[in-house]
């Protein structure tokens, strides 16, 4: 067994993990290591060849691969150690990591601090209760994206997409450009799940129909999918009888949401937020276990990669403060409460006297325009913010 002792271990080499490792080095943390299960750094950005990344951070419209490469280049120039093709199988409350690697075999690390940046995973057909057989041709949007962009395969000729999340919208355009006929996008909610710019650029510009308050009722086919039955939904999301329609297709793409990947967190006994499905965090993005931090989509599914990177930097600064003894997470905390029309807020708690400025990431419960956000502290309104965005919202407040 290979044994290592590090100051900071970052689990995951995606945008959050890379940003966290680089920021930790800037904060003076000496021995930093990234543990990544894939062959390369970059995470999901490896298969994102469309543009729109980095507008806030770099002021440019970069492809996902370009965005990732900027961080990879910085890591190569640093003394950050990277373990690729290494799978973490356990993280303990004592900040120990057990991993396995084809090159090193079993790896055991004792860490001064840990940043968990494992990202998120896609919901599958079984998690959204799709009825019918289990034929070939039913894929998550991320799988289709990898097939086309990285492996050079077309998974079908005629497609139906269930869900209007951003990756599903982007793949509607991508499949159209590759010659696949996208017959429609169906969304169970009464409003689209993706960003407005993706609705316009990926659907409207290519005349791909979007049907709201609708779902796939049944999958048809035995060996290979032959078609689906779609139907309209009422306000209770129940199928409206008589609205069923059969659509022939050989590909069903599921873009039905993402779930933070927290099996390691649960194994370490870290409490999770029922709304975000990620760890409960303070303003340093430290979990309820001192010295273990969370960043990126492992804590909440962000809409923009810029926010993912920013969360990694917040966690890294918190880890550096923890390692130096400046902030060991011992002070009493106040709960952050999501008020009217707010679905959730990250962080979920603030430690008294820790900081003057705190970054909040929040999402509304329903699409809104010209948003006014009130921040109430000790019963009195301390700040008011306005935004034209529906979601996401990022606030920097002085408390």
For each feature predicted by the language model, list its residue ranges.
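Predominantly flavin-linked oxidoreductase catalytic cores and closely associated redox partners
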Residues: 106-107, 116-210, 217-224, 298-303
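Mid-to-C-terminal Rossmann-like scaffold of FAD/NAD(P)H-dependent oxidoreductases
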Residues: 306, 314, 318-384
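A Rossmann-like FAD-binding core segment of flavoenzymes
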Residues: 70-99, 176-263, 356-384
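Beta1-alpha1 glycine-rich phosphate/pyrophosphate-binding loop at the start
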Residues: 6-70, 155-201
């Amino acid at each position: 067994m290979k044994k290592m002792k590090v100051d900071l271990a970052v689990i995951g080499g995606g945008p959050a993990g890379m940003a966290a490792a680089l920021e930790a080095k800037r904060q003076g943390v000496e021995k930093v290591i990234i543990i990544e299960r894939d062959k390369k750094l970059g995470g999901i950005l490896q298969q994102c060849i469309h543009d729109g990344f980095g507008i806030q951070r770099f002021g440019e419209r970069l492809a996902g691969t370009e965005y990732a490469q900027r961080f990879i280049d910085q890591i190569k120039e640093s003394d950050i150690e990277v373990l690729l093709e290494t799978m973490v199988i356990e993280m303990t409350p004592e900040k120990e990591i057990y991993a396995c690697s084809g090159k090193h075999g079993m790896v055991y690390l004792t860490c001064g601090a840990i940043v968990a940046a494992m990202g998120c995973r896609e919901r599958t057909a079984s998690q959204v209760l799709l009825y019918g057989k289990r034929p070939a041709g039913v894929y998550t949007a991320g799988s289709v994206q990898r097939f086309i962009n990285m492996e050079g395969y077309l998974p079908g000729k005629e497609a139906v997409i269930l869900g209007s999340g951003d990756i599903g919208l982007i793949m509607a355009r991508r499949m159209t450009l590759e010659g696949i006929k996208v017959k429609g996008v169906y969304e169970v909610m009464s409003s689209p799940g993706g960003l407005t710019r993706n609705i316009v650029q990926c659907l409207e510009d290519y005349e791909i129909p979007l049907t709201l308050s609708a779902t796939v009722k049944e999958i048809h086919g035995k060996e290979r999918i032959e078609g689906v039955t779609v139907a309209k939904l009422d306000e209770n999301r129940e199928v409206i009888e008589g609205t069923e329609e059969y659509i022939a297709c050989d590909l069903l793409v599921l873009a039905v949401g993402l779930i933070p990947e927290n099996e390691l967190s649960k194994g370490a006994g870290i409490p999770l937020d029922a709304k975000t499905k990620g760890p409960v965090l303070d303003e340093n993005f430290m979990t309820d276990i001192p010295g273990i931090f969370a960043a990126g989509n492992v804590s909440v599914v962000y809409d923009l990669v810029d926010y993912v990177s920013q969360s990694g930097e917040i966690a890294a600064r918190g880890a550096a403060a923890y390692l130096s003894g400046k902030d060991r997470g011992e002070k009493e905390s106040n709960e952050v409460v999501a008020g009217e029309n707010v679905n959730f807020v990250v962080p979920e708690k603030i430690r008294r006297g820790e900081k003057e400025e705190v970054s909040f990431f929040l999402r509304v419960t329903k699409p809104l325009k010209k948003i006014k956000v009130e921040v109430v502290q000790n019963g009195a309104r301390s700040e008011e913010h306005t935004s034209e965005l529906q979601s996401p919202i990022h606030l920097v407040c002085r408390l």
